[in-house]
Every structure is written in structure tokens, then in C-alpha cells.
Amino acid sequence: MGVATTLQPPTTSKTLQKQHLEAVGAYQYVLTFLFMGPFFSLLVFVLLFTSLWPFSVFYLVWLYVDWDTPNQGGRRSEWIRNRAIWRQLRDYYPVKLVKTAELPPDRNYVLGAHPHGIMCTGFLCNFSTESNGFSQLFPGLRPWLAVLAGLFYLPVYRDYIMSFGLCPVSRQSLDFILSQPQLGQAVVIMVGGAHEALYSVPGEHCLTLQKRKGFVRLALRHGASLVPVYSFGENDIFRLKAFATGSWQHWCQLTFKKLMGFSPCIFWGRGLFSATSWGLLPFAVPITTVVGRPIPVPQRLHPTEEEVNHYHALYMTALEQLFEEHKESCGVPASTCLTFI
């Protein structure tokens, strides 16, 4: 089939009010991504030592009772996923979703999402909200964006991200989703993970993939088709201070990742009120998420290494082909190549 894209608003000049609304949409996502989890964790702790301590105790009891919910499908809210603020976030860059092939809802899928970028903006916008009409482009599919399991330990923030359909990137959680009797489950895994964020340099396309094979094993165990997904522009919305491999700064980043599960990055965007100053507002660079063709995978409860390596190689080839087919239409120079590490 031909390429299908999401419907975008007419490309007319934006009013000042529209520009402000888009900036608010982009900025609130950054602030939520960076600070909501730590803020509510600290708040719940501090309230224990005030007259409002019953609120913290009540929530901690609820947290104990609700502990396994993220690994059992979470609590998705279509009301949250359809809010207008996500359309403002979409229009700020803008973010587009491109469909290159049909994904029939009579089977399950494991979508490998690349690159991770700093904040996975394109993937959240396209798979965790309806701002680009995922359910219309892929009718019958139920998307799940798999993220760092540690995020679901953070009070209040865990409930917030569950409402988008986010789930822990853990075997227990993903096995639960792909074992549901209702087919059409589409698990989106950012294969490069937090380590790949260290290579989120504008203009570069470096993926941590050569040794990442867990997603292939997952697909084999459940007979779920593999689907390559590439988000052009994801690395371009922030500037990153990249440290040379082997430097003490890079060593500190890797050590921190081993301890905490994510890599601390030094990054910056533009100022909220001035495009020439530094700040946390991302640069308004177009993000185009291209969903590739499905790769049929047989079900193997105990896949061999040969089978894993075979389908991993097929996936890498399909991903590279997807990149080559769409890079020029997405503003990437023809001479640019995809790099796997």
C-alpha cells in the first residue's frame, strides 16, 4: 500500500495566541517529564511531618494495594489521551505519524522505536495520545508504550503515566499484555533505552541495537510480528553535550545508569520567551514517526539463539531499509547513514 499520514492543520500563519498555546503544550511536557516524579515523591515524604500526614498515609496505603497494577495493564484513560493539550504539543514541532503498511488487528505486534532521543517526544505524542489519530490510522490496535520500570515507583506520577497507556518495560508486564485473549496489542519498545540518549546529537543517527535482542525474544515467545519504527527529528529538538567514549564524564554517565537505570544528560533548548537564549523549551523541529512493514514471527516458547539472531538480523535490515526510504523526505541528507552500535 502507499504511504498514509496523519491529517495536519492547514499550513497558514499562526496567530500569536496559537504560538503561545503550542509553547505551553511543549513546555508542560518537558516540566512533567523532568520534575513531576521527584516533586510528588518529595511532597508525599514531607507531608508525613506536617498536620496533613493523613494524606500521605492514605496514598501510601493505596500505593501498597495498587502496587501490581502497572504490570497488569495499568489504568488507561481515553479522556487523558484525547486532551487538546496534546494537539498543541503536536503542532509545536509539528509531529507527524506515517503509516507505510497495514497492521491487521488479528495479531499482536512488537514495535521497535528508534531513536530514544532525550524525551521520546514523538513516540509519546503518536502512541500514547490520540493527537495524531493512531486509532484511525491503525484501527483495532491498542498501543502500549513501554518505559523504565522505575518510573512506576514514583507516587502520583505512576498513576499519571498509566493513564496514557504506558507500561513497565519488564518481562512480567509485557508478557501480561501479549497474553491477553484480545488480539491487536501493539507494544512499543524503545530498544536503545536510556543508553541511547547519550547519542542524541542533532543530525546524527546512532542506534544502540546490535546487542539488544530481548525484544526479539519477546516477539518469538508470543508469535508477535516485529515492526520497525523510526522517528526522524527526535534527536534534533535539544542540543546535547556529548562526552567522548572513555572520558571520565562518560564513565560517570554509564556508572549512574547502572545504579539508577537511566543516563544523566546535559542538554538544553531555547528560552521560553526568547529563541536566542538557553532554556528547556525544545527547538521547534519537525518530528516524523514512520511505522514500517510488519515482519512475521513464529511462536517459540523457548527460542534458540539461532532463531533470535535470525529475526534480529531481519529486523535490522528492515529498519535500515525504512530509514533509507524515508530519510530524504524527512529532511535528512541523502549521504547520511544509519549507525548501529
From Swiss-Prot:
Where would you find this protein in the cell?
Answer: Endoplasmic reticulum membrane; Cytoplasm, Perinuclear region
Q: Which pathway or pathways does this protein act in?
A: Glycerolipid metabolism; triacylglycerol biosynthesis
InterPro entries assigned to the protein according to its UniProt record, in alphabetical order: DAGAT
Q: Quick one: where is this thing mainly located?
A: endoplasmic reticulum
Q: Which organism is it from?
A: Homo sapiens (Human)
Gene Ontology biological process terms, A to Z: glycerol metabolic process; monoacylglycerol biosynthetic process; triglyceride biosynthetic process
How would you summarize where this protein is expressed among tissues? Selectively expressed in the digestive system. Highly expressed in the ileum, and at lower level in jejunum, duodenum, colon, cecum and the rectum. Not expressed in the stomach and the esophagus and trachea. Expressed at very low level in liver.
Q: Which family does it belong to?
A: Belongs to the diacylglycerol acyltransferase family.
Concerning Pfam families, the annotation shows: DAGAT (PF03982)
EC nos: 2.3.1.20, 2.3.1.22
Per its record, the protein catalyses: a 2-acylglycerol + an acyl-CoA = a 1,2-diacylglycerol + CoA; an acyl-CoA + a 1,2-diacyl-sn-glycerol = a triacyl-sn-glycerol + CoA; 2-(9Z-octadecenoyl)-glycerol + (9Z)-octadecenoyl-CoA = 1,2-di-(9Z-octadecenoyl)-sn-glycerol + CoA; 2-(9Z-octadecenoyl)-glycerol + hexadecanoyl-CoA = 1-hexadecanoyl-2-(9Z-octadecenoyl)-sn-glycerol + CoA
The record's keywords, sorted A to Z, are: Acyltransferase, Cytoplasm, Endoplasmic reticulum, Glycerol metabolism, Glycoprotein, Lipid biosynthesis, Lipid metabolism, Membrane, Transferase, Transmembrane, Transmembrane helix, Ubl conjugation
Q: What is the effect of changing residue 265 to Y?
A: Catalitically inactive. No 2-acylglycerol O-acyltransferase neither diacylglycerol O-acyltransferase activities
Protein name per UniProt = 2-acylglycerol O-acyltransferase 3
Would the keyword Cell inner membrane turn up in this protein's UniProt record?
no
Molecular function (GO) terms for this protein are: 2-acylglycerol O-acyltransferase activity; diacylglycerol O-acyltransferase activity
Function, as annotated: Catalyzes the formation of diacylglycerol from 2-monoacylglycerol and fatty acyl-CoA. Also able to catalyze the terminal step in triacylglycerol synthesis by using diacylglycerol and fatty acyl-CoA as substrates. Has a preference toward palmitoyl-CoA and oleoyl-CoA. May be involved in absorption of dietary fat in the small intestine by catalyzing the resynthesis of triacylglycerol in enterocytes. Also able to use 1-monoalkylglycerol (1-MAkG) as an acyl acceptor for the synthesis of monoalkyl-monoacylglycerol (MAMAG).
